[in-house]
């Protein structure tokens, strides 16, 4: 299993997109975490794909850190 993060963004309607974030680790036991998040993308100030990916990446990192903290405790 390759280590890294993949983000797929798909439109849901004119105001929302779905970000599917797949986080993979390559270590002893390895693992994969998949999170799907619906994000509001206002028509008045829509975000470019790069901005959406950046937001999704930041969210994935926060989620992974919180998840790791629960495992350690």
Residue ranges and their predicted role:
Residues 2-6, 31-73:
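Acidic, low-complexity intrinsically disordered segments
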